[in-house]
Amino acid sequence: MTREELYLGSFLHDIGKFYQRADGALNDKNELSEQSKKLAEIICPEHNGFPSHQHVVWTNEFFEKNQQIFLRFISKDQLSNIVHAAVYHHRPDNPEAAIVQLADWWASGMDRSSMGIFEDPQLEKSELRFREIPLNNILCALRVKQSDNSFQTASRQSVFRLRPLSLHAHDIMPSDYSNETKLSTELYRKHWKEFIADLEKLEKRSFDYRGLSITLYYLLKKYTWCIPSFTQDNHPCISLFEHSKVTAAIAQCLFDFYQDKPESFRTNTTPKGYQMELDENVFPLLIAGFDLSGIQDYLYNISSANAAKSLRGRSFYLQMTLEALAWQI
């Protein structure tokens, strides 16, 4: 498996969460093929005699239904490696799937935070809470220390609606939390159909492997920026897109480190699959920061005519420059 294949596998490892919330239950009426249903016994961990982490079944179904789109840009062997890394990350059977699992664990450590004072007993009791709970505004988690050493928290909760990312304020600005802002299978199904419609447009495109990776990155950003990654918290504030992006970044670092220093990893085969751990005092991750000097002069050295438009254009250019640097590195 190549580094590029591992990247796409890790980036798309949780696409099944999106698909599952738009579909029925595993043992109910759904869009799953018989092949995907049978695969559940192999790729899902077992909990109290039942398969858990069932979203991986829908991850497999996503690839199965859309394989012809992928095969326009990559070979069958490449697609097979990508699918394996994504689908087996909860019960890995090789080092690459175990790397995705480890990256998923590390990235998930950023998801498990509590919002504090806000509770919704109905969501606590709902078996469909993973379909109902919306992505929360992270600013509501702020606790401001007062002069008497007490902490002030947000007076109300705000959440994001399930809408494609756009420049319209009503799509991207949070709304006050209420029964009207809860999500549902119907809302997810509509959102999923819009995502698939955009994905199918790739059938008319022609680009290389890198072009496919970048296109899928921005396509998932458009549709999963507003989807909560982890729904066991009452008020999750990490999106599925951010979790997928961080998982892919960590997985690539672990893959590179494993290629250079395999002796730093401990492997173990258990009933839960092929598991991998790092030795203590081993640091495979490096965070890179970029500083574009002189940006204030660049930003504000503009004429007064159409100043707002020029300022937005230059700000966008700087943002895309940083993104291009990140992609290149």
Predicted regions mapped to residue ranges:
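Catalytic-site or vestigial catalytic-site microsegments of nucleotide-handling domains
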Residues: I287-D297
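Conserved helix-loop-beta segment at the catalytic/binding core of cyclic-nucleotide signaling proteins
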Residues: E323-I329
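Phosphate/oxyanion-binding active-site loops and adjacent basic polyanion-contact surfaces
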Residues: P51-T59, S239-T247, L311-L322
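Divalent metal-dependent catalytic cores for phosphoryl transfer on phosphate-bearing substrates
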Residues: M1-H168, I172, F230, E280, ...
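Extended, charge-enriched "interface" segments that sit outside catalytic cores
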Residues: S158-P236
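Alpha-helical phosphate/pyrophosphate-handling elements in metalloenzyme active cores
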Residues: M1-G9, F18, F63-D77, I238-Q275
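Extended catalytic cores and adjacent scaffolds of nucleotide/polyanion-binding enzymes
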Residues: Q296-S310, F316-Q319, E323
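A short, charged/proline- and glycine-enriched loop
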Residues: V282-L285
